[in-house]
Amino acid sequence: MRKDLFAFLIIIIGVFTSCNHSQTRLEARGGDTVRFEYARHLKIVKYQGYSIATLTDPWKQGKILHTYALVPKGKVGDEVCKAFSSGNNQEVTIVRTPITRSVVFTTVHCALLYDLKAESAIKGVCDLQYISIPDVQQRAKLPISDAHHVVDCGNSMSSNVEKIIDLKPEAIMVSPFENSGGYGKLDKLHIPLIEMADYMEESSLGRAEWMKFYGMLFGREKAADSLFN
């Protein structure tokens, strides 16, 4: 894992060398690692202008499940995205933050977004009939024209791709499974798939600590830290 991470950082340094020398110097000095006391499958390093979140594969020791670049919206973030794109680095999924439009596949993570006061970012859900959050059920009954309306995107194992496309989400929150073979049509939408592997943590505190990652995604980092602590 350390070798993979080191190689990844070398790639990123190369990307910024070709686009912005001052940014490269910042990168070369390294970033600030977010402290995780209990989570074992998540590492986040903050750099100037973006953060890198690395999810280790809970089923394959030493392998990486997914790597995300969390890039703030705005002009500075636009330049960071250009640097990533010019490097043709297909191993990194860029997520513009804060996410304000998302499709959430699990009731657990819907509840977490409510705890983080980020429920307005829930625009679509899967398995609506199993979501025990009264407000989500009420929002699903609202007229489609209502800004608070939540769309039922069908079964999480075979979601309605057309409905998801219509929502224009900035991210889709999915649960990874061992040997799943990917996410079918969702993989082809060019919409960031956030693989919520928190349930594979061995301890309840480890699972809960992932809220720091979700807080960063939805612009609720301080709320997540406060909630966890």
Q: Language-model segments: which ranges?
A:
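N-terminal ligand-binding lobe of clamshell/alpha-beta domains
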Residues: 19-229
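Bacterial Sec-dependent N-terminal signal peptides
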Residues: 1-24
